[in-house]
Amino acid sequence: MRGRAKSAALTAATAVLARPVLAAGTLVTLAVGVLLHRLQGVLLPVAWGGVGVAAAIARRPGMPGRPVPPEAEPDLAELVARVASAVGFGQPVLVRIVPEPTASLARPRVAGARTYVLVLGWPFLRLLARPELEAVVAHELAHRAELTSAAFRALSRSRERLAGGLERRPRIPAALAGRLLRASQARMWALELAADRASAEVAGPAAASGALTRTATLGALFERLVAGWIDVAAGRGRFPEDLYEAVADALADPHVQRRARLLVADDEALDPYAAADHPPLRDRLAALPMVPPAGYDPAPVPIRDPVGLEEWCLRDLLDQLDAAPGTLEPFALRDAGPNAYLPPVWEAYSALRVATGTRSTDAAVAAALDSLEDGGWVGLAESVEPAVRRLPPLLRRPAARDVLAGCLGVAVAGRLLDRGWRRASRWLTSVVRPPAGEVLDLQEMVTAAMDSGDAGPVRDLLALPTGAR
Protein backbone atom coordinates (compact mmCIF):
# COMPACT_ATOMS: atom_id res chain seq x y z
CA MET A 1 0.00 0.00 0.00
CA ARG A 2 2.86 2.37 0.85
CA GLY A 3 4.38 1.76 -2.60
CA ARG A 4 1.09 2.59 -4.29
CA ALA A 5 0.75 5.79 -2.29
CA LYS A 6 4.29 6.81 -3.20
CA SER A 7 3.63 6.07 -6.87
CA ALA A 8 0.38 8.05 -6.80
CA ALA A 9 2.10 11.00 -5.14
CA LEU A 10 4.89 10.90 -7.73
CA THR A 11 2.37 10.80 -10.57
CA ALA A 12 0.42 13.70 -9.10
CA ALA A 13 3.53 15.82 -8.62
CA THR A 14 4.72 15.06 -12.15
CA ALA A 15 1.31 15.89 -13.61
CA VAL A 16 1.11 19.20 -11.74
CA LEU A 17 4.60 20.31 -12.76
CA ALA A 18 3.93 19.24 -16.36
CA ARG A 19 1.01 21.71 -16.53
CA PRO A 20 2.36 24.86 -14.87
CA VAL A 21 -0.30 27.19 -16.30
CA LEU A 22 -3.14 24.96 -15.13
CA ALA A 23 -1.53 24.49 -11.71
CA ALA A 24 -0.91 28.21 -11.25
CA GLY A 25 -4.42 29.04 -12.41
CA THR A 26 -5.91 26.55 -9.97
CA LEU A 27 -3.95 28.06 -7.07
CA VAL A 28 -5.03 31.58 -8.03
CA THR A 29 -8.68 30.61 -8.35
CA LEU A 30 -8.46 28.72 -5.06
CA ALA A 31 -7.15 31.88 -3.40
CA VAL A 32 -9.96 33.91 -4.96
CA GLY A 33 -12.36 31.22 -3.86
CA VAL A 34 -11.27 31.60 -0.26
CA LEU A 35 -12.24 35.25 -0.49
CA LEU A 36 -15.63 34.40 -1.99
CA HIS A 37 -16.42 31.83 0.75
CA ARG A 38 -18.80 28.89 0.67
CA LEU A 39 -20.10 27.38 -2.54
CA GLN A 40 -18.55 29.87 -4.95
CA GLY A 41 -15.19 29.31 -3.30
CA VAL A 42 -15.38 25.61 -4.04
CA LEU A 43 -16.85 25.79 -7.53
CA LEU A 44 -14.39 28.32 -8.96
CA PRO A 45 -11.20 26.22 -8.66
CA VAL A 46 -13.12 23.08 -9.60
CA ALA A 47 -14.39 24.81 -12.73
CA TRP A 48 -10.89 26.03 -13.62
CA GLY A 49 -9.46 22.54 -13.18
CA GLY A 50 -12.31 21.11 -15.24
CA VAL A 51 -11.56 23.52 -18.06
CA GLY A 52 -7.91 22.44 -18.02
CA VAL A 53 -8.75 18.75 -18.05
CA ALA A 54 -11.28 19.24 -20.86
CA ALA A 55 -8.72 21.17 -22.88
CA ALA A 56 -6.14 18.42 -22.39
CA ILE A 57 -8.62 15.78 -23.53
CA ALA A 58 -9.57 17.88 -26.55
CA ARG A 59 -5.89 18.21 -27.53
CA ARG A 60 -5.28 14.47 -27.25
CA PRO A 61 -4.81 13.19 -30.82
CA GLY A 62 -6.74 10.30 -32.28
CA MET A 63 -5.11 7.08 -33.42
CA PRO A 64 -2.40 7.77 -35.98
CA GLY A 65 -1.91 6.04 -39.27
CA ARG A 66 -3.88 3.92 -41.69
CA PRO A 67 -5.66 0.70 -40.65
CA VAL A 68 -4.42 -2.50 -42.26
CA PRO A 69 -7.17 -5.17 -42.14
CA PRO A 70 -6.00 -8.80 -41.85
CA GLU A 71 -7.53 -9.71 -45.20
CA ALA A 72 -5.59 -6.91 -46.91
CA GLU A 73 -2.18 -8.09 -45.65
CA PRO A 74 -2.50 -11.75 -44.60
CA ASP A 75 1.24 -12.35 -44.07
CA LEU A 76 1.51 -9.41 -41.71
CA ALA A 77 -1.67 -10.46 -39.91
CA GLU A 78 -0.33 -14.01 -39.54
CA LEU A 79 2.94 -12.70 -38.09
CA VAL A 80 1.14 -10.52 -35.53
CA ALA A 81 -1.25 -13.34 -34.57
CA ARG A 82 1.58 -15.84 -34.14
CA VAL A 83 3.63 -13.47 -32.01
CA ALA A 84 0.55 -12.60 -29.93
CA SER A 85 -0.01 -16.29 -29.28
CA ALA A 86 3.65 -16.79 -28.36
CA VAL A 87 3.54 -14.05 -25.71
CA GLY A 88 0.16 -15.23 -24.40
CA PHE A 89 -1.66 -12.13 -25.53
CA GLY A 90 -5.06 -13.75 -26.03
CA GLN A 91 -6.78 -10.66 -27.46
CA PRO A 92 -7.45 -9.48 -31.03
CA VAL A 93 -4.92 -6.92 -32.27
CA LEU A 94 -5.64 -4.35 -34.96
CA VAL A 95 -2.74 -3.00 -37.01
CA ARG A 96 -2.15 0.52 -38.32
CA ILE A 97 0.81 1.84 -40.29
CA VAL A 98 2.49 5.23 -40.06
CA PRO A 99 5.18 6.80 -42.28
CA GLU A 100 7.86 7.15 -39.59
CA PRO A 101 10.04 4.43 -38.01
CA THR A 102 8.11 3.84 -34.80
CA ALA A 103 6.14 1.12 -33.03
CA SER A 104 3.67 1.31 -30.18
CA LEU A 105 0.71 -0.45 -28.60
CA ALA A 106 -2.45 1.43 -27.62
CA ARG A 107 -5.85 0.50 -26.23
CA PRO A 108 -8.33 3.06 -27.57
CA ARG A 109 -12.07 2.71 -27.92
CA VAL A 110 -13.01 1.25 -31.30
CA ALA A 111 -16.74 0.97 -31.99
CA GLY A 112 -17.38 1.61 -28.29
CA ALA A 113 -15.08 -1.12 -26.96
CA ARG A 114 -11.50 -1.04 -25.72
CA THR A 115 -9.35 -2.61 -28.45
CA TYR A 116 -5.63 -3.25 -28.75
CA VAL A 117 -4.08 -1.40 -31.69
CA LEU A 118 -0.51 -2.03 -32.83
CA VAL A 119 1.06 0.91 -34.68
CA LEU A 120 3.95 -0.01 -36.98
CA GLY A 121 6.12 2.31 -39.05
CA TRP A 122 6.31 1.60 -42.76
CA PRO A 123 10.15 1.72 -42.65
CA PHE A 124 10.07 -1.25 -40.27
CA LEU A 125 7.81 -3.27 -42.57
CA ARG A 126 9.93 -2.38 -45.57
CA LEU A 127 13.46 -2.65 -44.19
CA LEU A 128 13.49 -5.02 -41.21
CA ALA A 129 13.99 -8.75 -41.65
CA ARG A 130 10.95 -10.80 -40.75
CA PRO A 131 12.50 -12.12 -37.49
CA GLU A 132 13.43 -8.54 -36.54
CA LEU A 133 9.85 -7.41 -37.13
CA GLU A 134 8.66 -10.31 -34.98
CA ALA A 135 10.95 -9.05 -32.21
CA VAL A 136 9.51 -5.53 -32.54
CA VAL A 137 5.93 -6.83 -32.38
CA ALA A 138 6.72 -9.07 -29.40
CA HIS A 139 8.30 -6.15 -27.54
CA GLU A 140 5.23 -3.97 -28.02
CA LEU A 141 2.73 -6.69 -27.13
CA ALA A 142 4.70 -7.36 -23.95
CA HIS A 143 3.58 -3.91 -22.76
CA ARG A 144 -0.04 -5.07 -22.50
CA ALA A 145 -0.03 -5.14 -18.69
CA GLU A 146 0.95 -1.48 -18.48
CA LEU A 147 -1.89 -0.46 -20.80
CA THR A 148 -4.48 -1.98 -18.47
CA SER A 149 -3.13 0.00 -15.50
CA ALA A 150 -4.72 3.42 -15.16
CA ALA A 151 -1.99 4.43 -12.70
CA PHE A 152 0.78 3.53 -15.14
CA ARG A 153 -0.92 5.31 -18.03
CA ALA A 154 -1.24 8.44 -15.92
CA LEU A 155 2.43 8.27 -14.91
CA SER A 156 3.55 7.65 -18.49
CA ARG A 157 1.53 10.58 -19.87
CA SER A 158 2.77 12.89 -17.12
CA ARG A 159 6.39 11.88 -17.74
CA GLU A 160 6.00 12.48 -21.47
CA ARG A 161 4.49 15.91 -20.95
CA LEU A 162 7.04 16.89 -18.31
CA ALA A 163 9.98 15.79 -20.49
CA GLY A 164 8.59 17.70 -23.46
CA GLY A 165 8.08 20.77 -21.29
CA LEU A 166 11.81 21.04 -20.63
CA GLU A 167 12.23 22.62 -24.07
CA ARG A 168 8.95 24.56 -24.30
CA ARG A 169 7.50 27.75 -22.91
CA PRO A 170 6.33 28.37 -20.24
CA ARG A 171 9.57 26.99 -18.82
CA ILE A 172 9.26 24.18 -16.30
CA PRO A 173 11.84 24.33 -13.45
CA ALA A 174 14.39 21.93 -14.93
CA ALA A 175 16.06 20.86 -11.69
CA LEU A 176 12.75 19.91 -10.07
CA ALA A 177 11.56 18.24 -13.26
CA GLY A 178 14.77 16.21 -13.34
CA ARG A 179 14.24 14.95 -9.80
CA LEU A 180 10.69 13.86 -10.56
CA LEU A 181 11.66 12.20 -13.83
CA ARG A 182 14.59 10.43 -12.20
CA ALA A 183 12.34 9.06 -9.47
CA SER A 184 10.23 7.17 -12.02
CA GLN A 185 12.85 6.37 -14.68
CA ALA A 186 14.05 3.11 -13.12
CA ARG A 187 10.54 1.67 -13.31
CA MET A 188 10.19 2.65 -16.97
CA TRP A 189 13.55 1.12 -17.83
CA ALA A 190 12.74 -2.13 -16.03
CA LEU A 191 9.57 -2.50 -18.09
CA GLU A 192 11.48 -1.92 -21.33
CA LEU A 193 14.12 -4.50 -20.43
CA ALA A 194 11.39 -7.00 -19.59
CA ALA A 195 9.79 -6.38 -22.99
CA ASP A 196 13.19 -6.90 -24.64
CA ARG A 197 13.49 -10.28 -22.93
CA ALA A 198 10.04 -11.22 -24.19
CA SER A 199 11.04 -10.31 -27.73
CA ALA A 200 14.19 -12.43 -27.45
CA GLU A 201 12.14 -15.41 -26.26
CA VAL A 202 9.86 -15.14 -29.29
CA ALA A 203 12.22 -14.14 -32.11
CA GLY A 204 15.55 -15.28 -30.68
CA PRO A 205 18.32 -13.16 -29.15
CA ALA A 206 20.00 -12.53 -32.52
CA ALA A 207 16.84 -11.12 -34.10
CA ALA A 208 16.03 -9.14 -30.94
CA SER A 209 19.52 -7.63 -31.01
CA GLY A 210 19.23 -6.87 -34.71
CA ALA A 211 15.83 -5.26 -34.19
CA LEU A 212 17.10 -3.01 -31.40
CA THR A 213 20.09 -1.89 -33.44
CA ARG A 214 18.26 -1.34 -36.72
CA THR A 215 15.26 0.44 -35.23
CA ALA A 216 17.60 2.81 -33.36
CA THR A 217 19.56 3.43 -36.57
CA LEU A 218 16.39 4.09 -38.57
CA GLY A 219 15.10 6.45 -35.90
CA ALA A 220 18.31 8.50 -35.91
CA LEU A 221 18.41 8.52 -39.71
CA PHE A 222 14.85 9.81 -40.02
CA GLU A 223 15.21 12.44 -37.30
CA ARG A 224 18.59 13.84 -38.33
CA LEU A 225 18.81 13.24 -42.09
CA VAL A 226 15.52 12.30 -43.75
CA ALA A 227 13.57 15.16 -42.14
CA GLY A 228 16.19 17.50 -43.57
CA TRP A 229 15.87 16.01 -47.05
CA ILE A 230 12.13 16.63 -46.98
CA ASP A 231 12.47 20.21 -45.70
CA VAL A 232 15.16 21.18 -48.21
CA ALA A 233 13.24 19.64 -51.12
CA ALA A 234 10.03 21.38 -50.01
CA GLY A 235 11.90 24.68 -49.94
CA ARG A 236 12.64 24.10 -53.60
CA GLY A 237 9.00 23.28 -54.35
CA ARG A 238 9.54 19.52 -54.58
CA PHE A 239 8.83 16.30 -52.70
CA PRO A 240 10.79 13.01 -53.03
CA GLU A 241 8.53 10.32 -54.47
CA ASP A 242 11.21 7.66 -53.91
CA LEU A 243 11.90 8.63 -50.29
CA TYR A 244 11.88 5.10 -48.87
CA GLU A 245 14.11 3.77 -51.65
CA ALA A 246 16.52 6.59 -50.85
CA VAL A 247 16.43 5.64 -47.16
CA ALA A 248 17.34 2.06 -48.08
CA ASP A 249 20.24 3.32 -50.21
CA ALA A 250 21.46 5.61 -47.43
CA LEU A 251 21.37 2.76 -44.91
CA ALA A 252 23.73 0.81 -47.16
CA ASP A 253 26.28 3.66 -47.03
CA PRO A 254 28.95 2.83 -44.39
CA HIS A 255 29.45 6.54 -43.64
CA VAL A 256 25.74 6.95 -42.91
CA GLN A 257 25.80 3.83 -40.74
CA ARG A 258 28.68 5.25 -38.72
CA ARG A 259 27.02 8.66 -38.40
CA ALA A 260 23.77 7.03 -37.23
CA ARG A 261 25.60 4.96 -34.59
CA LEU A 262 27.35 8.08 -33.29
CA LEU A 263 24.07 10.01 -33.21
CA VAL A 264 22.37 7.25 -31.23
CA ALA A 265 25.26 7.08 -28.75
CA ASP A 266 25.40 10.88 -28.34
CA ASP A 267 21.64 11.23 -27.90
CA GLU A 268 21.50 8.46 -25.30
CA ALA A 269 24.46 9.88 -23.39
CA LEU A 270 22.59 13.19 -23.14
CA ASP A 271 19.94 12.61 -20.49
CA PRO A 272 20.78 14.97 -17.61
CA TYR A 273 17.14 15.26 -16.55
CA ALA A 274 16.32 11.51 -16.77
CA ALA A 275 13.72 12.13 -19.47
CA ALA A 276 14.50 8.95 -21.46
CA ASP A 277 11.89 6.21 -21.04
CA HIS A 278 14.19 3.61 -22.66
CA PRO A 279 17.63 2.50 -21.43
CA PRO A 280 20.64 3.18 -23.69
CA LEU A 281 21.00 0.79 -26.60
CA ARG A 282 24.25 -0.67 -25.26
CA ASP A 283 22.54 -1.57 -21.96
CA ARG A 284 19.59 -3.15 -23.76
CA LEU A 285 21.87 -5.24 -25.95
CA ALA A 286 23.94 -6.32 -22.95
CA ALA A 287 20.80 -7.42 -21.09
CA LEU A 288 19.74 -9.87 -23.82
CA PRO A 289 20.52 -13.58 -23.31
CA MET A 290 24.09 -14.46 -24.24
CA VAL A 291 24.05 -17.07 -27.00
CA PRO A 292 26.35 -17.91 -29.91
CA PRO A 293 25.74 -15.61 -32.90
CA ALA A 294 23.01 -16.92 -35.16
CA GLY A 295 22.01 -15.86 -38.62
CA TYR A 296 18.49 -15.39 -39.92
CA ASP A 297 16.78 -14.74 -43.22
CA PRO A 298 17.12 -11.01 -44.03
CA ALA A 299 13.95 -10.98 -46.16
CA PRO A 300 11.14 -8.71 -44.86
CA VAL A 301 7.60 -9.91 -44.31
CA PRO A 302 5.77 -10.15 -47.66
CA ILE A 303 3.42 -7.21 -48.26
CA ARG A 304 0.60 -7.69 -50.75
CA ASP A 305 0.10 -4.00 -51.60
CA PRO A 306 3.46 -2.29 -50.98
CA VAL A 307 2.80 0.39 -53.60
CA GLY A 308 -0.54 1.41 -52.10
CA LEU A 309 0.77 1.51 -48.52
CA GLU A 310 3.90 3.42 -49.49
CA GLU A 311 1.94 5.96 -51.51
CA TRP A 312 -0.35 6.53 -48.52
CA CYS A 313 2.72 7.10 -46.28
CA LEU A 314 4.18 9.59 -48.74
CA ARG A 315 0.87 11.47 -48.90
CA ASP A 316 0.72 11.57 -45.12
CA LEU A 317 4.23 13.02 -44.92
CA LEU A 318 3.26 15.53 -47.59
CA ASP A 319 0.17 16.55 -45.59
CA GLN A 320 2.37 17.17 -42.54
CA LEU A 321 4.22 19.88 -44.49
CA ASP A 322 1.03 21.97 -44.68
CA ALA A 323 1.78 22.74 -48.32
CA ALA A 324 -1.14 23.68 -50.54
CA PRO A 325 -2.32 20.76 -52.71
CA GLY A 326 -0.38 20.49 -55.95
CA THR A 327 2.31 23.01 -54.98
CA LEU A 328 5.11 20.46 -54.50
CA GLU A 329 6.36 18.69 -57.60
CA PRO A 330 7.35 15.02 -57.17
CA PHE A 331 10.92 14.14 -58.06
CA ALA A 332 13.26 11.16 -57.86
CA LEU A 333 15.68 11.94 -55.04
CA ARG A 334 18.06 9.12 -55.97
CA ASP A 335 18.49 10.56 -59.47
CA ALA A 336 19.03 14.13 -58.25
CA GLY A 337 22.22 15.84 -57.17
CA PRO A 338 22.89 16.51 -53.46
CA ASN A 339 21.85 20.15 -53.86
CA ALA A 340 18.28 18.94 -54.38
CA TYR A 341 17.94 17.58 -50.83
CA LEU A 342 20.95 18.72 -48.74
CA PRO A 343 21.34 22.26 -47.37
CA PRO A 344 23.74 24.27 -49.56
CA VAL A 345 27.23 24.87 -48.21
CA TRP A 346 26.81 28.65 -48.55
CA GLU A 347 24.23 28.56 -45.73
CA ALA A 348 26.93 27.32 -43.34
CA TYR A 349 29.32 29.99 -44.65
CA SER A 350 26.72 32.71 -44.13
CA ALA A 351 25.79 31.51 -40.63
CA LEU A 352 29.44 31.56 -39.55
CA ARG A 353 30.10 35.01 -41.03
CA VAL A 354 27.10 36.47 -39.20
CA ALA A 355 27.93 34.68 -35.93
CA THR A 356 31.60 35.73 -35.96
CA GLY A 357 31.04 39.23 -37.33
CA THR A 358 33.52 38.69 -40.16
CA ARG A 359 33.18 39.49 -43.85
CA SER A 360 35.02 36.59 -45.47
CA THR A 361 34.32 32.89 -45.16
CA ASP A 362 37.97 32.06 -44.48
CA ALA A 363 38.03 34.58 -41.62
CA ALA A 364 34.78 33.17 -40.23
CA VAL A 365 36.11 29.60 -40.31
CA ALA A 366 39.36 30.73 -38.66
CA ALA A 367 37.44 32.55 -35.91
CA ALA A 368 35.25 29.50 -35.34
CA LEU A 369 38.32 27.27 -35.02
CA ASP A 370 39.78 29.74 -32.52
CA SER A 371 36.60 29.42 -30.44
CA LEU A 372 37.13 25.66 -30.20
CA GLU A 373 40.42 26.31 -28.41
CA ASP A 374 39.55 29.32 -26.27
CA GLY A 375 36.25 27.87 -25.03
CA GLY A 376 34.04 30.44 -26.72
CA TRP A 377 32.36 27.91 -28.99
CA VAL A 378 29.20 27.63 -26.89
CA GLY A 379 28.46 31.33 -27.36
CA LEU A 380 29.30 31.04 -31.05
CA ALA A 381 26.86 28.15 -31.43
CA GLU A 382 24.18 30.21 -29.70
CA SER A 383 24.75 32.92 -32.30
CA VAL A 384 24.42 30.37 -35.10
CA GLU A 385 21.24 28.94 -33.58
CA PRO A 386 19.62 31.29 -31.01
CA ALA A 387 17.19 28.57 -29.87
CA VAL A 388 20.10 26.98 -27.98
CA ARG A 389 19.98 29.87 -25.48
CA ARG A 390 16.43 28.95 -24.49
CA LEU A 391 17.25 25.37 -23.50
CA PRO A 392 17.59 24.30 -19.85
CA PRO A 393 21.15 24.74 -18.52
CA LEU A 394 22.25 21.10 -18.71
CA LEU A 395 21.01 20.75 -22.30
CA ARG A 396 22.60 23.94 -23.60
CA ARG A 397 26.21 22.83 -24.00
CA PRO A 398 25.46 19.49 -25.73
CA ALA A 399 23.05 21.25 -28.10
CA ALA A 400 25.68 23.90 -28.85
CA ARG A 401 28.18 21.13 -29.59
CA ASP A 402 25.76 19.53 -32.04
CA VAL A 403 24.92 22.82 -33.78
CA LEU A 404 28.49 24.02 -34.23
CA ALA A 405 29.85 20.61 -35.25
CA GLY A 406 27.27 20.44 -38.02
CA CYS A 407 27.73 24.01 -39.25
CA LEU A 408 31.52 24.22 -39.02
CA GLY A 409 31.98 20.67 -40.32
CA VAL A 410 30.05 21.53 -43.48
CA ALA A 411 31.91 24.84 -43.87
CA VAL A 412 35.34 23.22 -43.62
CA ALA A 413 34.27 20.45 -45.99
CA GLY A 414 33.06 23.11 -48.42
CA ARG A 415 36.44 24.86 -48.43
CA LEU A 416 38.16 21.54 -49.11
CA LEU A 417 35.72 20.70 -51.91
CA ASP A 418 36.62 24.06 -53.46
CA ARG A 419 40.25 22.88 -53.48
CA GLY A 420 39.66 19.71 -55.42
CA TRP A 421 38.52 17.28 -52.74
CA ARG A 422 35.48 15.12 -53.54
CA ARG A 423 32.37 14.04 -51.72
CA ALA A 424 32.72 10.56 -50.24
CA SER A 425 28.99 10.23 -49.56
CA ARG A 426 26.06 11.69 -51.43
CA TRP A 427 24.13 11.78 -48.15
CA LEU A 428 26.62 13.65 -45.92
CA THR A 429 28.25 16.90 -47.02
CA SER A 430 30.91 16.79 -44.30
CA VAL A 431 32.33 13.42 -45.42
CA VAL A 432 35.00 14.12 -48.05
CA ARG A 433 37.84 12.39 -49.85
CA PRO A 434 41.17 14.05 -50.73
CA PRO A 435 42.68 13.58 -54.19
CA ALA A 436 44.85 10.85 -52.67
CA GLY A 437 44.23 9.53 -49.18
CA GLU A 438 41.62 8.35 -46.70
CA VAL A 439 38.05 9.56 -46.32
CA LEU A 440 37.56 12.13 -43.55
CA ASP A 441 34.42 13.16 -41.69
CA LEU A 442 34.88 16.85 -40.90
CA GLN A 443 31.94 16.87 -38.49
CA GLU A 444 33.69 14.21 -36.41
CA MET A 445 36.95 16.14 -36.57
CA VAL A 446 35.29 19.36 -35.40
CA THR A 447 33.57 17.49 -32.57
CA ALA A 448 36.91 16.01 -31.50
CA ALA A 449 38.45 19.49 -31.59
CA MET A 450 35.69 20.82 -29.33
CA ASP A 451 36.17 18.00 -26.86
CA SER A 452 39.98 18.27 -26.81
CA GLY A 453 40.40 22.02 -27.25
CA ASP A 454 42.83 21.39 -30.11
CA ALA A 455 41.76 22.52 -33.58
CA GLY A 456 45.23 21.89 -35.04
CA PRO A 457 44.27 18.85 -37.19
CA VAL A 458 41.48 20.82 -38.87
CA ARG A 459 43.73 23.84 -39.44
CA ASP A 460 46.37 21.58 -40.97
CA LEU A 461 43.88 20.37 -43.57
CA LEU A 462 42.95 23.92 -44.54
CA ALA A 463 46.64 24.85 -44.82
CA LEU A 464 47.39 22.12 -47.34
CA PRO A 465 48.15 23.25 -50.91
CA THR A 466 45.32 22.81 -53.40
CA GLY A 467 44.99 19.17 -54.41
CA ALA A 468 47.32 17.96 -51.63
CA ARG A 469 46.94 14.91 -49.41
Residues covered by each model-derived region:
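Cytosolic juxtamembrane N-terminal segments of multi-pass membrane proteins
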Residues: 1-9
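Canonical alpha-helical transmembrane segments of integral membrane proteins
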Residues: 10-34
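Alpha-helical transmembrane segments
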Residues: 19, 23, 51-59
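Hydrophobic alpha-helical transmembrane segments
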Residues: 27-49
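Peri-catalytic and regulatory segments of divalent metal-dependent proteins
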Residues: 56-157
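An active-site-proximal "capping" alpha-helix that borders the catalytic cofactor pocket
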Residues: 81-84, 138, 187-208
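Post-HEXXH active-site segment of zinc metalloproteases
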Residues: 146-174
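Cytosolic-facing loops and C-terminal tails of multi-pass membrane proteins
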Residues: 173, 177, 181, 205-469
